[in-house]
Swiss-Prot record:
Keywords: Amino-acid biosynthesis, Cytoplasm, Histidine biosynthesis. This is ATP phosphoribosyltransferase regulatory subunit. Disulfide bonds: none annotated. The gene is hisZ. Gene3D superfamilies: Bira Bifunctional Protein, Domain 2.
Length: 392
């Protein structure tokens, strides 16, 4: 039988040092959230497709398959909607501060270079309408990045209500909205100029400026306020100012008024995290006050933060933060009747491990191959050194 030894597109193996580093990062992040008072939650990797088939997730690239009863199921592409399902269907009392970590899966196109399997960690703050919920998410993200020693990172803020207000006033068709979204995401000056000419409105000056409205928070927000009198947009800008003033003492904060998240469920402040050594954002989140409505008749305010732990592992590696695993310095060869003594000796001796070879000569050969400097033999007679590497 010839097995296919290739991996599916967008997946990869992690070995030894990288796998250990990824494991430690996940532990650090979870521990940090626990210290801030978040309660851990876990959801299945497999969900029914209905959880992700709402208008909020129309663009999601899902791994779909049928279960044994013919029902359509998917591998979760994010954690937020499953947590929304849990909160809406279990009757847990609100408000809540939840944390999570686990695998997510997105069926990206081949040759795009994107990872289809990612390890994600994050928090969900549900039931708090106050702007302090956004502030907590941003502070938590900054705190995690500092704990992981990520160098030269920057937090970028946007506001989903700005884009929503613009398309509401323009009254665009679905196709036109998709085209407009693409122009905004690409910061296409020429394309937006052409769009405004074909779709004139009272927001022309503001829309034309959107591709340039990114950078230092205070200057950009002041410029944006001078370009419009629309109350909805001005309210969003003032909300951004409040958050910038609250969190700017902790990190470098910038804004991008053309920031449009991939998921449509965001309703308020949105944010991303970048670093000099990263090609793309590794932190994202925002407010989504209507997300839970797809699971229940009532809504609840919510804010979330997600971290791409694979990207953070790569960042730590590039920054030289990941330490080499502590090497084994002593190999313990033992006779079976002396196993209790060998086990006790290993527990008491740092950086030691048991040998699984039947003969001492094989244990010594293994030690030489893996550069283990010393081998001892534990028998009923006691402990004897049988190999010691010469020091140069």
């Amino acid at each position: 039988m010839n097995l296919n030894k290739n991996l599916p597109t967008g997946t990869r193996d992690k070995l030894f040092r990288e796998a250990q580093a990824a494991y430690k990062i996940e532990q650090q992040v979870n521990h940090y959230f626990e210290k801030r008072g978040f309660k851990r939650i876990e959801t299945p990797v497999i969900e029914f497709e209905d959880v992700f088939s709402s208008e909020h997730q129309a663009d999601a690239k899902l791994y779909r398959f049928f279960d044994e009863k013919g029902r359509l199921t998917v591998l979760r592409p994010d954690m937020t909607l499953p947590i929304g399902r849990v909160v809406s269907t279990t009757g847990v009392m609100l408000p809540l501060k939840l944390s999570y970590s686990g695998k997510i899966f997105r069926a990206n196109e081949d040759f795009g270079g994107e990872q289809n399997e990612q390890t994600q960690a994050g928090i969900e703050i549900i039931g708090y309408p106050s702007i302090k919920a956004e502030i907590e998410c941003i502070l938590s993200g900054i705190g995690v990045l500092n704990a992981l020693e990520i160098p030269n990172f920057q937090i970028e803020l946007g506001h989903a209500a700005i884009y929503r207000r613009v398309i509401q006033l323009l009254n665009l068709s679905e196709t036109a909205e998709i085209d407009f979204r693409q122009l905004i995401q690409n910061k296409s000056l020429t394309g937006i100029k052409r769009f405004v000419a074909n779709n004139p409105s009272t927001l022309d000056d503001f829309i034309l400026a959107i591709p340039r409205l990114f950078g230092p928070a205070t200057a950009i927000l002041n410029q944006a306020k001078s370009l419009t009198t629309d109350k909805g947009i001005l309210t969003a800008l003032r909300e951004m100012e409040t958050i910038v003033e609250a969190v700017s003492y902790t990190a470098d904060i910038s804004v991008d008024l053309g920031l449009v998240q991939d998921f449509h469920y965001y309703t308020g402040i949105i944010f991303r995290g970048y670093a000099d050594l990263a090609a793309d954002n590794f932190l994202s989140g925002g407010r989504y006050d209507h997300l839970l409505e797809q699971f229940t008749s009532s809504s609840s305010p919510a804010v979330g933060l997600a971290l791409n732990l694979d990207s953070l592992t790569t960042l730590q590696n590039r920054a030289g933060i990941i330490k080499k695993q502590t090497p084994t310095t002593l190999l313990i060869h033992y006779d079976l009747e002396a196993l209790p003594q060998a086990e006790k000796f290993m527990q008491e001796t740092p950086n030691s491990e048991l040998s699984f070879f039947e003969t001492a000569s094989n244990a010594i050969s293994f030690a030489k191959k893996w550069h283990i400097p010393e081998v001892v033999h534990v028998s009923s007679q006691g402990i004897q050194t049988i190999f010691q590497r010469e020091v140069d």
